[in-house]
Design a protein with these regions (language model features):
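Two-component/phosphorelay signaling modules centered on CheY-like receiver
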Residues: 15-33
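Acidic, metal-coordinating helix/loop segments flanking the phosphotransfer/catalytic sites
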Residues: 34-53, 61
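Alpha4 helix (beta4-alpha4-beta5 surface) of REC/receiver domains from two-component response regulators
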Residues: 67-68, 90-108, 119
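C-terminal output helix
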Residues: 112-121, 129, 133
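Conserved acidic carboxylate
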Residues: 12
């Protein structure tokens, strides 16, 4: 179980994606918490004892973006060093340079590969970055 005892917080507005993420991660030993829209992310994070990794959708409903949420999370002392990975259908050639500049720990293109997803997050948890654009890796 490559994610045993790891707590992963996911911000994702699509229920089907949340279920796919959750199933893949729980199967590998992680505990998973969710925020659907992004607007209550800081509230939820402040009420958790710890989070080992945060997964952010970049294109959320109601005008909130993962880029905005990233900056808000980095403003919390408790979470300013927690790795944050973007998971998005956004064009990687546009997203990745911006994510790297902003300080994200990785990008995983949607649709995710549910077999690779836990391994990719484990890689980030080990201190490396992951820039996955589907069939190839940047």
């Amino acid at each position: 179980m490559i994610l045993k005892e790891k707590r992963i917080f996911i911000v994702e507005d699509n229920m089907q994606n949340r279920l796919v993420f959750q199933m893949a991660l729980i199967r590998h030993g992680a505990s998973v918490d969710f925020e659907r829209w992004g607007r209550d992310t800081l509230y939820h994070l402040q009420n958790l004892s710890r989070v080992d990794l945060i997964v952010l959708d970049l294109m959320l409903a109601e005008g909130v973006t993962g880029f905005d949420i990233f900056d808000q999370i980095r403003g919390l002392v408790k979470y300013n060093a927690v790795p944050i990975v973007a998971v998005s259908a956004m064009d990687p050639s546009i997203a990745i340079p911006r994510l790297q500049k902003q300080g994200f720990s990785g990008f995983i293109a949607k649709p995710i590969d549910s077999h690779q997803f836990p391994k990719q997050l484990a890689t980030v948890l080990s201190g490396e970055t992951v820039w996955s654009v589907g069939e190839r890796t940047a």
